[in-house]
Design a protein with these regions (language model features):
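Glycine-rich loop-to-alpha-helix module at the N-terminal edge of alpha/beta enzyme cores
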Residues: 49-140, 149
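Terminal low-complexity tails and localization/encapsulation signals of metabolic enzymes
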Residues: 1-54, 87, 91, 139-160
Length: 160
């Protein structure tokens, strides 16, 4: 086993430790919850088909609660000034970049993708948040950047 592989596996196991004894649930209305379904399942790594943690299955009630929470939060977010949205989205992107190695190693164990690919995916995700952060101040008025080959419009309705 190469030094890099051994090192990556050791670091991945450290990051995965927090999932071993804690069932991963849902994040609804600003809180972590195990939901109402009551059924959990093993999250198996494709590397060797062993359990790396447990995950709660979502129920119809959990989906309804998440949609209701999104609807409740929608007006507040829609009325948040573009400069504040920009700050929050950039802060989130900063956190993703700070934890890109952790995200890459955990996701690699979770889905079997190469670590280098998952790290780039995390960095790309952060770049997407930064792109929309930069657009937030100018989008506050419901307008968007015009391009001749596109028709742009805004629908202010939460979709979930």
């Amino acid at each position: 086993m190469s030094d890099t592989l051994a090192s990556n596996l050791a670091r991945a196991q450290q990051y995965l430790e927090r999932f071993k004894n804690n069932t991963t649930g849902h994040y609804i209305k600003g809180e972590f919850t195990l939901g109402t379904g009551g059924r959990e399942y093993d999250n198996l790594t494709p590397t060797d088909n062993t359990a790396i943690g447990k995950v709660m299955a979502g129920s119809t009630q959990d989906v309804d609660a998440a949609c209701e929470a999104a609807q409740e939060a929608f007006e507040g977010w829609a009325n948040t000034p573009g400069s504040e949205r920009k700050r929050l989205l950039n802060k989130f992107a900063d956190r993703v970049v700070e934890r890109a190695d952790e995200i890459a190693l955990v996701e690699s164990m979770d889905c079997g993708q190469a670590v280098r690919y998952m790290k780039k995916a995390a960095e790309r995700g952060a770049a997407n948040f930064r792109f929309f952060a930069d657009k937030a101040p100018e989008a506050q008025d419901g307008q968007s950047t015009q391009q001749p080959e596109h028709t742009n419009f805004t629908v202010r309705k939460a979709i979930g």
